[in-house]
Structures are given as C-alpha cells and as structure tokens.
C-alpha cells in the first residue's frame, strides 16, 4: 500500500507540530518537512538539533504514528565538500536521522557552476552515514532541469529522484513509462496540491509500485501554495486532497 505524505509546503504556514496533528486527523500517513535553506523555517529550526520544536515534535510523531517521509532542502553547492555543523545540509542530515526520515531532498541552483553530479555524490555518501537516502528534485532554470539530467546526476550514487506528476498533463501510460524508466532511481512521486483540488485524475497512479510513496506538495518549483488556497477549512481541504490521491492510486478494475 502506497504511503501518502503531506508536505509542509502545501499547508504553509503551519508549524511542524500543527502539520503532524493535521495529517493525523485527516488520515494522512506521513509528512514532508523543510528544515533548512528556506528562510521561513528558520523560526523553528535555526538551532538545528537543539531547536525546542524538535523536542515537541518527536512525542507527537510517536503518539500519532505519523512518519516523516523526507526532510529538505539541501542546495547543491561547494560547501558540501566541507563538513561544518553550521552548514544547512548538516542540519538537514542531523534532523533527518533523528526524525526517522527516509529521504533528504536536494536541488541544484542556477548560480552554482560546480558539477551537480559531483556534489550530489558527496551528499549521497553523507546521507548514507545518517541512514538517509538522498533524492534530487528537477527544477526548471537550474543545471538539473529535466529528468534525463537528474538521472545522469544520480547515476551510480545510490541516490534517487523525486518524480513530479501532474494530473493535468500526465496520463496513466506516461506515468507508467516514467516509473519503468527510472526503475530503482525512483524515490517518491510528488503531486501538486493545486492540481488535486478538483479531484485529480482517477487511476493516474494505479500501477505505481506499492513501496513508492506519494507526496502532496506545493508547486513543482517548491513554492508554497497561494494564500487564498489556505484561507479555507484546512482539515476538510487535506481530507479532500487525500481522497484525490486515493482515487489516483485505485485501479479502474477495483471499481467493478
């Protein structure tokens, strides 16, 4: 059975504890957390593993049995060559292992000229030491702007790729082909919350392997959802998002 995760970017500006409580009440299995390299999370995670929110969050995760799918984000930059606890990537790794996350997510940035494959390989090795698997996200306008570029970056590293799926533009056959092409490089599937508002596309993810999680996220570029989307009943909204993902995972033959 595919795990469904609610990413923090889809319910901004909830704090991590509120995110877990919302996910649990809405029947969502997991969450995705931003813990570094984003200004909006500094209020919670600026002290890394010494942040008070960590000590509030762990008991809530345990009591609700909500798991952490991934922590992010890590920017692929030259600082990865130097192990320094002050760097954002170290914070992500340290918090990821303490929260029991499966993945740490990274992205290339437009202003870094270093080879992203070299930098990702460094991150993938560091992540293994923290019992995490590094994943790369495809971001337009960066050196990793396509799936082909992402596959080249993660090759032979043990890392993987976040596959962005759009209910508005992808078909079930396209998704199936992408999953087969990525093979073991597939980390998890991410679907923009905005494209689930109308119920998504039933059966779109029906052939997704059961071990592959589906994350409800913000936009593919990682930006939070618009504020007007947030000015609604959040519990009802998240329950509807979860129902839309369930429908996309359900094979058409299951209805007969």
PLM segments and residue spans:
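Histidine-acidic metal/acid-base catalytic patches
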Residues: 1-5, 13, 17-27, 90, ...
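N-terminal pre-domain/capping segments
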Residues: 1-91, 97, 101, 132, ...
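Hydrophobic faces of well-ordered beta-strands that scaffold small-molecule active sites
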Residues: 2-9, 31-33, 68-73, 104-106, ...
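Active-site-proximal loop/turn and secondary-structure-junction residues that shape catalytic pockets
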Residues: 10-12, 35-37, 74-77, 108-112, ...
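Active-site-adjacent beta->alpha loops and helix N-cap segments on the catalytic face
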Residues: 49-52, 111-122, 143-146, 172-173
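Catalytic-core regions built around general acid/base machinery
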Residues: 49-65, 118-129, 178, 202-207
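Active-site groove signature of glycoside hydrolases
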Residues: 96-114
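Conserved anion-binding
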Residues: 129-149
């Amino acid at each position: 059975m595919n795990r469904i995760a609610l990413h923090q970017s889809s319910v901004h500006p909830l704090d991590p504890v509120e995110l877990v409580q919302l996910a649990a009440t809405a029947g969502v299995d997991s969450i995705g957390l931003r813990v570094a390299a984003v200004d909006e999370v500094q209020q919670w995670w600026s002290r890394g593993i010494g942040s008070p929110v960590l000590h509030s969050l762990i008991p809530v995760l345990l009591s609700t049995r909500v798991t952490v799918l991934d922590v992010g984000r890590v920017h692929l930059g030259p600082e990865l060559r130097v192990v320094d606890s002050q760097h954002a990537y170290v914070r992500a790794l340290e918090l990821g292992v303490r929260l029991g996350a499966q993945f740490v997510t990274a992205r290339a940035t437009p202003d870094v000229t270093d080879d992203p494959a070299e930098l990702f390989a460094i991150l993938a090795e560091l992540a293994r030491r923290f019992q995490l698997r590094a994943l790369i996200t495809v971001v337009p306008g960066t050196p990793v702007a396509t799936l082909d570029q992402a596959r080249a970056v993660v090759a032979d590293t043990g890392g993987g790729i976040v596959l962005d799926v759009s209910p508005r533009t992808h078909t079930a056959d396209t998704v199936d082909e992408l999953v087969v092409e990525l093979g073991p490089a597939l980390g998890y599937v991410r679907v923009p919350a905005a494209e689930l508002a109308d119920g998504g596309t039933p059966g779109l993810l029906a052939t997704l392997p059961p071990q592959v999680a589906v994350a409800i996220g913000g936009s593919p570029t990682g930006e939070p959802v618009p504020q007007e989307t947030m000015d609604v009943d959040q519990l009802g909204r998240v329950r509807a998002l979860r129902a839309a993902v369930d429908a996309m995972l359900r094979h058409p033959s299951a209805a007969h």
